[in-house]
Protein backbone atom coordinates (compact mmCIF):
# COMPACT_ATOMS: atom_id res chain seq x y z
CA UNK A 1 0.00 0.00 0.00
CA UNK A 2 1.48 3.40 -0.98
CA UNK A 3 1.73 6.38 1.33
CA UNK A 4 -0.80 8.24 -0.83
CA UNK A 5 -3.33 5.42 -0.49
CA UNK A 6 -2.79 5.36 3.28
CA UNK A 7 -3.54 9.10 3.52
CA UNK A 8 -6.70 8.71 1.46
CA UNK A 9 -7.94 5.87 3.66
CA UNK A 10 -7.08 7.82 6.81
CA UNK A 11 -8.85 10.94 5.58
CA UNK A 12 -11.91 8.95 4.54
CA UNK A 13 -12.10 7.24 7.93
CA UNK A 14 -11.52 10.53 9.77
CA UNK A 15 -14.25 12.23 7.74
CA UNK A 16 -16.70 9.43 8.51
CA UNK A 17 -15.94 9.61 12.25
CA UNK A 18 -16.29 13.40 12.22
CA UNK A 19 -19.62 13.22 10.40
CA UNK A 20 -20.87 10.61 12.85
CA UNK A 21 -19.84 12.79 15.78
CA UNK A 22 -21.97 15.65 14.41
CA UNK A 23 -25.20 13.59 14.60
CA UNK A 24 -27.43 14.75 17.46
CA UNK A 25 -28.67 11.46 18.90
CA UNK A 26 -31.03 13.22 21.31
CA UNK A 27 -33.25 14.16 18.38
CA UNK A 28 -35.38 11.53 16.69
CA UNK A 29 -34.60 11.34 12.95
CA UNK A 30 -37.32 12.65 10.69
CA UNK A 31 -39.04 9.84 8.81
CA UNK A 32 -38.60 9.63 5.08
CA UNK A 33 -41.49 9.55 2.64
CA UNK A 34 -43.90 6.65 3.00
CA UNK A 35 -43.09 3.88 0.52
CA UNK A 36 -45.45 3.52 -2.39
CA UNK A 37 -47.25 0.19 -2.17
CA UNK A 38 -48.68 -1.28 -5.33
CA UNK A 39 -50.56 -4.49 -4.56
CA UNK A 40 -51.83 -4.91 -8.08
CA UNK A 41 -55.47 -5.02 -9.12
CA UNK A 42 -56.62 -8.65 -9.47
CA UNK A 43 -58.42 -9.90 -12.54
CA UNK A 44 -61.09 -12.48 -11.81
CA UNK A 45 -63.44 -15.06 -13.26
CA UNK A 46 -65.66 -17.88 -11.97
CA UNK A 47 -65.99 -21.49 -13.03
CA UNK A 48 -69.40 -23.10 -13.42
CA UNK A 49 -68.84 -25.19 -10.28
CA UNK A 50 -68.55 -22.03 -8.16
CA UNK A 51 -64.76 -21.74 -7.87
CA UNK A 52 -63.75 -18.08 -7.82
CA UNK A 53 -60.35 -17.29 -9.36
CA UNK A 54 -58.28 -14.13 -8.75
CA UNK A 55 -55.14 -13.40 -10.75
CA UNK A 56 -52.45 -10.78 -10.10
CA UNK A 57 -49.72 -10.56 -12.74
CA UNK A 58 -46.26 -9.69 -11.42
CA UNK A 59 -43.40 -10.32 -13.83
CA UNK A 60 -40.58 -9.01 -11.64
CA UNK A 61 -39.35 -12.53 -10.81
CA UNK A 62 -39.90 -15.84 -12.67
CA UNK A 63 -42.01 -17.45 -9.97
CA UNK A 64 -45.66 -17.98 -9.12
CA UNK A 65 -47.71 -18.69 -6.00
CA UNK A 66 -51.13 -20.34 -5.80
CA UNK A 67 -53.45 -20.30 -2.81
CA UNK A 68 -56.58 -22.46 -2.77
CA UNK A 69 -58.79 -21.29 0.09
CA UNK A 70 -61.98 -23.03 1.24
CA UNK A 71 -63.89 -20.27 3.03
CA UNK A 72 -66.20 -22.33 5.25
CA UNK A 73 -67.71 -21.09 8.51
CA UNK A 74 -66.39 -22.78 11.67
CA UNK A 75 -67.35 -26.47 11.78
CA UNK A 76 -68.45 -28.18 15.00
CA UNK A 77 -67.00 -31.71 15.11
CA UNK A 78 -68.42 -32.81 18.48
CA UNK A 79 -67.33 -36.23 19.73
CA UNK A 80 -65.29 -36.68 16.55
CA UNK A 81 -63.09 -33.62 16.97
CA UNK A 82 -59.98 -34.22 14.91
CA UNK A 83 -61.80 -35.15 11.71
CA UNK A 84 -60.83 -31.91 9.97
CA UNK A 85 -57.20 -32.30 11.04
CA UNK A 86 -57.05 -35.86 9.74
CA UNK A 87 -58.69 -34.83 6.47
CA UNK A 88 -56.04 -32.17 5.95
CA UNK A 89 -53.26 -34.65 6.75
CA UNK A 90 -54.56 -37.12 4.16
CA UNK A 91 -54.93 -34.53 1.40
CA UNK A 92 -51.82 -34.06 -0.71
CA UNK A 93 -50.60 -37.65 -0.32
CA UNK A 94 -50.73 -38.22 -4.04
CA UNK A 95 -54.07 -38.90 -5.73
CA UNK A 96 -56.01 -41.65 -7.46
CA UNK A 97 -53.83 -40.97 -10.49
CA UNK A 98 -50.37 -40.77 -8.91
CA UNK A 99 -48.78 -42.47 -5.90
CA UNK A 100 -47.66 -40.51 -2.86
CA UNK A 101 -44.02 -41.34 -3.58
CA UNK A 102 -44.17 -40.23 -7.22
CA UNK A 103 -46.15 -37.12 -6.25
CA UNK A 104 -43.61 -35.99 -3.65
CA UNK A 105 -40.66 -36.91 -5.86
CA UNK A 106 -41.91 -34.77 -8.73
CA UNK A 107 -42.55 -31.75 -6.51
CA UNK A 108 -39.01 -32.06 -5.13
CA UNK A 109 -37.59 -32.45 -8.65
CA UNK A 110 -39.33 -29.24 -9.72
CA UNK A 111 -37.93 -27.42 -6.69
CA UNK A 112 -41.49 -26.49 -5.78
CA UNK A 113 -43.67 -26.52 -2.67
CA UNK A 114 -47.19 -27.84 -2.27
CA UNK A 115 -49.05 -28.07 1.05
CA UNK A 116 -52.61 -29.10 1.90
CA UNK A 117 -54.96 -28.61 4.83
CA UNK A 118 -58.65 -29.17 5.39
CA UNK A 119 -59.16 -25.54 4.33
CA UNK A 120 -57.26 -25.57 1.05
CA UNK A 121 -53.77 -25.74 -0.40
CA UNK A 122 -50.72 -23.62 -1.18
CA UNK A 123 -48.16 -24.03 -3.97
CA UNK A 124 -45.08 -22.12 -5.07
CA UNK A 125 -42.79 -22.79 -8.02
CA UNK A 126 -40.85 -21.27 -10.86
CA UNK A 127 -43.18 -19.92 -13.51
CA UNK A 128 -41.94 -22.40 -16.11
CA UNK A 129 -43.41 -25.21 -13.97
CA UNK A 130 -46.68 -23.39 -13.27
CA UNK A 131 -48.83 -25.53 -15.54
CA UNK A 132 -47.65 -28.80 -14.00
CA UNK A 133 -47.96 -27.46 -10.45
CA UNK A 134 -51.56 -26.40 -11.03
CA UNK A 135 -52.26 -29.83 -12.48
CA UNK A 136 -50.76 -31.56 -9.41
CA UNK A 137 -52.66 -29.28 -7.01
CA UNK A 138 -55.97 -29.83 -8.79
CA UNK A 139 -55.47 -33.58 -9.07
CA UNK A 140 -54.68 -33.98 -5.36
CA UNK A 141 -57.58 -31.70 -4.37
CA UNK A 142 -60.20 -33.26 -6.62
CA UNK A 143 -59.08 -36.91 -6.61
CA UNK A 144 -57.70 -37.61 -3.12
CA UNK A 145 -56.56 -41.15 -2.45
CA UNK A 146 -57.87 -41.83 1.06
CA UNK A 147 -56.56 -45.23 2.17
CA UNK A 148 -56.90 -47.08 5.46
CA UNK A 149 -53.14 -47.48 5.70
CA UNK A 150 -52.43 -43.76 5.47
CA UNK A 151 -55.40 -42.98 7.72
CA UNK A 152 -54.02 -45.23 10.47
CA UNK A 153 -50.57 -43.59 10.17
CA UNK A 154 -51.95 -40.06 10.42
CA UNK A 155 -54.25 -41.03 13.27
CA UNK A 156 -51.30 -42.41 15.26
CA UNK A 157 -49.30 -39.22 14.57
CA UNK A 158 -52.16 -37.04 15.81
CA UNK A 159 -52.60 -39.06 19.01
CA UNK A 160 -48.84 -39.00 19.67
CA UNK A 161 -48.86 -35.22 19.28
CA UNK A 162 -51.80 -34.87 21.68
CA UNK A 163 -50.05 -37.03 24.29
CA UNK A 164 -46.92 -34.88 24.06
CA UNK A 165 -49.03 -31.82 24.93
CA UNK A 166 -50.71 -33.31 28.01
CA UNK A 167 -48.27 -31.63 30.41
CA UNK A 168 -47.45 -28.54 28.34
CA UNK A 169 -48.89 -25.60 30.26
CA UNK A 170 -49.33 -23.34 27.22
CA UNK A 171 -51.25 -26.03 25.30
CA UNK A 172 -53.58 -26.73 28.21
CA UNK A 173 -54.07 -23.02 28.80
CA UNK A 174 -54.99 -22.44 25.16
CA UNK A 175 -57.63 -25.18 25.26
CA UNK A 176 -59.17 -23.91 28.47
CA UNK A 177 -59.22 -20.31 27.26
CA UNK A 178 -61.24 -21.26 24.18
CA UNK A 179 -63.57 -23.59 26.09
CA UNK A 180 -64.34 -20.90 28.67
CA UNK A 181 -64.79 -18.14 26.10
CA UNK A 182 -66.92 -19.99 23.55
CA UNK A 183 -68.31 -23.03 25.34
CA UNK A 184 -67.83 -26.63 24.24
CA UNK A 185 -70.83 -26.46 21.89
CA UNK A 186 -69.11 -23.90 19.68
CA UNK A 187 -66.46 -24.84 17.07
CA UNK A 188 -63.90 -22.53 18.66
CA UNK A 189 -64.58 -23.94 22.13
CA UNK A 190 -64.20 -27.64 21.42
CA UNK A 191 -60.81 -29.32 21.35
CA UNK A 192 -59.35 -32.56 20.09
CA UNK A 193 -58.56 -35.38 22.53
CA UNK A 194 -57.31 -38.93 22.18
CA UNK A 195 -60.87 -40.15 22.79
CA UNK A 196 -62.41 -38.00 20.04
CA UNK A 197 -59.68 -39.01 17.57
CA UNK A 198 -60.33 -42.68 18.31
CA UNK A 199 -63.98 -42.07 17.38
CA UNK A 200 -63.01 -40.96 13.87
CA UNK A 201 -63.10 -43.47 11.01
CA UNK A 202 -61.88 -43.30 7.43
CA UNK A 203 -65.53 -42.98 6.42
CA UNK A 204 -65.84 -39.84 8.57
CA UNK A 205 -62.88 -38.30 6.74
CA UNK A 206 -64.40 -39.12 3.36
CA UNK A 207 -67.74 -37.62 4.43
CA UNK A 208 -66.04 -34.48 5.77
CA UNK A 209 -64.23 -34.06 2.45
CA UNK A 210 -67.43 -34.46 0.41
CA UNK A 211 -69.43 -32.00 2.52
CA UNK A 212 -66.88 -29.27 3.21
CA UNK A 213 -64.07 -29.44 0.63
CA UNK A 214 -66.24 -28.04 -2.16
CA UNK A 215 -65.73 -25.36 -4.85
CA UNK A 216 -68.84 -23.35 -3.92
CA UNK A 217 -66.96 -21.61 -1.10
CA UNK A 218 -63.51 -21.83 -2.69
CA UNK A 219 -61.11 -19.19 -3.98
CA UNK A 220 -58.03 -19.80 -6.11
CA UNK A 221 -55.56 -16.91 -5.96
CA UNK A 222 -52.69 -16.92 -8.46
CA UNK A 223 -49.92 -14.32 -8.12
CA UNK A 224 -46.71 -14.00 -10.07
CA UNK A 225 -45.11 -14.33 -13.47
CA UNK A 226 -48.24 -15.53 -15.26
CA UNK A 227 -50.61 -14.43 -17.98
CA UNK A 228 -54.30 -14.03 -17.16
CA UNK A 229 -55.51 -15.90 -20.22
CA UNK A 230 -53.09 -18.75 -19.52
CA UNK A 231 -54.36 -19.01 -15.94
CA UNK A 232 -57.95 -19.05 -17.16
CA UNK A 233 -57.24 -21.81 -19.67
CA UNK A 234 -55.34 -23.96 -17.17
CA UNK A 235 -57.93 -23.48 -14.42
CA UNK A 236 -60.76 -24.46 -16.74
CA UNK A 237 -58.73 -27.49 -17.82
CA UNK A 238 -57.80 -28.78 -14.37
CA UNK A 239 -60.51 -27.54 -11.98
CA UNK A 240 -63.72 -27.84 -14.01
CA UNK A 241 -64.10 -31.51 -13.00
CA UNK A 242 -64.36 -30.50 -9.32
CA UNK A 243 -67.92 -31.53 -8.49
CA UNK A 244 -70.34 -28.70 -7.83
CA UNK A 245 -71.93 -28.91 -4.37
CA UNK A 246 -74.13 -26.88 -2.05
CA UNK A 247 -72.01 -24.89 0.41
CA UNK A 248 -72.47 -25.87 4.06
CA UNK A 249 -74.95 -23.95 6.19
CA UNK A 250 -74.04 -24.20 9.87
CA UNK A 251 -75.58 -22.82 13.06
CA UNK A 252 -74.53 -22.96 16.69
CA UNK A 253 -74.93 -21.01 19.90
CA UNK A 254 -73.28 -17.59 19.98
CA UNK A 255 -70.84 -17.06 22.87
CA UNK A 256 -71.50 -14.33 25.41
CA UNK A 257 -69.42 -12.71 28.11
CA UNK A 258 -69.98 -13.73 31.72
CA UNK A 259 -71.96 -11.13 33.75
CA UNK A 260 -69.15 -10.69 36.29
CA UNK A 261 -65.40 -11.22 36.35
CA UNK A 262 -64.75 -14.95 36.61
CA UNK A 263 -61.51 -16.49 37.87
CA UNK A 264 -60.52 -20.01 36.80
CA UNK A 265 -57.57 -21.98 38.15
CA UNK A 266 -55.87 -25.08 36.78
CA UNK A 267 -53.31 -26.68 39.08
CA UNK A 268 -50.22 -27.89 37.18
CA UNK A 269 -47.76 -29.30 39.75
CA UNK A 270 -44.98 -29.58 37.13
CA UNK A 271 -45.21 -25.92 36.10
CA UNK A 272 -42.37 -23.60 37.11
CA UNK A 273 -44.29 -20.58 35.83
CA UNK A 274 -47.87 -19.37 35.88
CA UNK A 275 -49.57 -18.71 32.57
CA UNK A 276 -52.11 -15.91 33.01
CA UNK A 277 -54.73 -14.78 30.51
CA UNK A 278 -57.36 -12.08 30.92
CA UNK A 279 -59.92 -12.46 28.15
CA UNK A 280 -63.39 -11.58 26.98
CA UNK A 281 -65.59 -11.95 23.90
CA UNK A 282 -65.57 -9.14 21.32
CA UNK A 283 -67.69 -8.79 18.22
CA UNK A 284 -65.26 -6.94 15.97
CA UNK A 285 -65.55 -6.90 12.18
CA UNK A 286 -63.16 -5.40 9.63
CA UNK A 287 -66.11 -3.41 8.28
CA UNK A 288 -66.76 -1.69 11.64
CA UNK A 289 -66.19 2.07 11.79
CA UNK A 290 -64.00 1.71 14.88
CA UNK A 291 -61.99 -1.27 13.58
CA UNK A 292 -58.73 0.66 13.09
CA UNK A 293 -59.21 2.53 16.38
CA UNK A 294 -59.63 -0.79 18.20
CA UNK A 295 -56.44 -2.17 16.64
CA UNK A 296 -54.49 0.93 17.66
CA UNK A 297 -55.83 0.71 21.22
CA UNK A 298 -54.70 -2.91 21.46
CA UNK A 299 -51.29 -2.00 20.02
CA UNK A 300 -50.86 0.60 22.76
CA UNK A 301 -52.01 -1.81 25.45
CA UNK A 302 -50.10 -4.94 24.51
CA UNK A 303 -49.23 -5.09 20.83
CA UNK A 304 -45.45 -4.90 21.08
CA UNK A 305 -42.33 -4.61 23.21
CA UNK A 306 -43.02 -0.92 23.94
CA UNK A 307 -46.67 -1.53 24.89
CA UNK A 308 -48.06 -0.62 28.28
CA UNK A 309 -48.39 -4.08 29.79
CA UNK A 310 -44.93 -5.15 28.58
CA UNK A 311 -43.30 -1.99 29.94
CA UNK A 312 -45.13 -2.52 33.23
CA UNK A 313 -44.63 -6.24 33.83
CA UNK A 314 -41.25 -6.67 32.16
CA UNK A 315 -39.35 -3.40 32.22
CA UNK A 316 -40.71 -1.97 35.48
CA UNK A 317 -41.58 -5.01 37.60
CA UNK A 318 -39.28 -7.64 36.09
CA UNK A 319 -41.97 -10.32 36.36
CA UNK A 320 -41.65 -11.74 32.85
CA UNK A 321 -39.78 -11.82 29.54
CA UNK A 322 -42.84 -10.48 27.73
CA UNK A 323 -46.50 -9.55 28.18
CA UNK A 324 -48.80 -9.00 25.22
CA UNK A 325 -52.42 -8.66 24.16
CA UNK A 326 -54.33 -9.58 21.02
CA UNK A 327 -57.64 -8.54 19.51
CA UNK A 328 -59.40 -10.88 17.12
CA UNK A 329 -61.91 -10.23 14.37
CA UNK A 330 -64.12 -12.78 12.65
CA UNK A 331 -66.70 -12.29 9.93
CA UNK A 332 -68.57 -15.39 11.12
CA UNK A 333 -69.19 -14.25 14.69
CA UNK A 334 -67.64 -13.14 17.97
CA UNK A 335 -63.91 -13.47 18.59
CA UNK A 336 -61.66 -12.75 21.59
CA UNK A 337 -59.60 -10.10 23.26
CA UNK A 338 -56.83 -11.62 25.38
CA UNK A 339 -53.96 -10.23 27.44
CA UNK A 340 -51.45 -12.93 28.39
CA UNK A 341 -48.22 -13.31 30.32
CA UNK A 342 -46.01 -16.05 31.79
CA UNK A 343 -44.55 -15.15 35.18
CA UNK A 344 -42.78 -16.69 38.16
CA UNK A 345 -45.18 -18.53 40.42
CA UNK A 346 -44.42 -16.18 43.31
CA UNK A 347 -45.69 -13.09 41.47
CA UNK A 348 -48.86 -14.59 39.99
CA UNK A 349 -51.26 -12.48 42.05
CA UNK A 350 -49.30 -9.26 41.51
CA UNK A 351 -49.25 -9.86 37.75
CA UNK A 352 -53.02 -10.30 37.62
CA UNK A 353 -53.44 -7.01 39.48
CA UNK A 354 -51.17 -5.18 37.02
CA UNK A 355 -52.89 -6.66 33.95
CA UNK A 356 -56.32 -5.62 35.21
CA UNK A 357 -54.96 -2.19 36.12
CA UNK A 358 -53.63 -1.54 32.60
CA UNK A 359 -56.86 -2.75 30.98
CA UNK A 360 -58.86 -0.48 33.27
CA UNK A 361 -56.64 2.52 32.50
CA UNK A 362 -56.95 2.25 28.73
CA UNK A 363 -60.72 1.92 29.10
CA UNK A 364 -61.18 4.93 31.37
CA UNK A 365 -58.42 7.43 30.54
CA UNK A 366 -57.67 9.06 27.16
CA UNK A 367 -54.49 8.00 25.39
CA UNK A 368 -51.81 10.70 25.31
CA UNK A 369 -51.33 12.44 21.97
CA UNK A 370 -47.66 11.48 21.73
CA UNK A 371 -48.43 7.83 22.51
CA UNK A 372 -51.07 7.71 19.80
CA UNK A 373 -48.80 9.47 17.29
CA UNK A 374 -45.97 6.99 17.92
CA UNK A 375 -48.30 4.01 17.63
CA UNK A 376 -49.73 5.24 14.34
CA UNK A 377 -46.20 5.68 12.97
CA UNK A 378 -45.21 2.14 13.96
CA UNK A 379 -48.41 0.38 12.93
Descriptions of predicted regions:
Residues 59-61, 72-76, 97, 127-130, ...:
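Solvent-exposed loop/turn segments at secondary-structure junctions
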Residues 67-127, 190, 304-319, 331:
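M16/MPP (pitrilysin/insulinase) zinc-metallopeptidase core fold and M16-derived inactive scaffolds
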Residues 1-24:
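Bacterial Sec-dependent N-terminal signal peptides
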Residues 53, 65-71, 137, 275-277:
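A short acidic-to-branched-hydrophobic micro-motif
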Residues 3, 22-25, 46, 102-248, ...:
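Charge-rich, well-structured scaffold segments of protease-associated domains
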Residues 31, 35-64:
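Mature N-terminal segment immediately following signal peptide/propeptide cleavage
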Residues 61-63, 81, 116-118, 172, ...:
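Short, solvent-exposed loop/turn segments at the edges of secondary structure
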Residues 23-32, 219-284:
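An aromatic/glycine/proline-enriched structural segment found at the starts
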